[in-house]
Amino acid sequence: MAKIQIKSEKLTPFGGIFSIIEQFDSTLSSVIDSTLGLRCRSFGYRYSEIIRSLMSIYFSGGSCIEDVTTHLMNHLSLHPTLRTCSSDTILRAIKELTQENISYTSDTGKNYNFNTADTLNTLLLNCMFASGQLKEGETYDDFLYK
């Protein structure tokens, strides 16, 4: 015979998202905030909260940033400590983190634009060290198959 339980708490259709968010918070939030720095002094969202909101969109089957406001906000607000920001806040933070392109003109006169995204590349490396994907003192080769 099947056991039936009656739950009094509210449920979310995105089963498991809260455990993923809690794992993210325990592993990467402090790394993100220490790498990217303080975003605002009083009220507002930290960069880790903004990146977590962005991540939640895609882990919940969303396809655009606006999905956090239109579909997820009500469900993610069920978590007792989670602060989820709006799509406008996510877009402002992405703009804050951008860097200007660097232009290079070759000897033949051809112009090239590139972007080193130093801050975000540093964040990527710090997150990979924090999650154990890279080890301090190890050597890694990175190459591209074509």
Model region roles, listed by residue range:
Residues 1-146:
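Dynamic "connector" segments at or just before major functional cores
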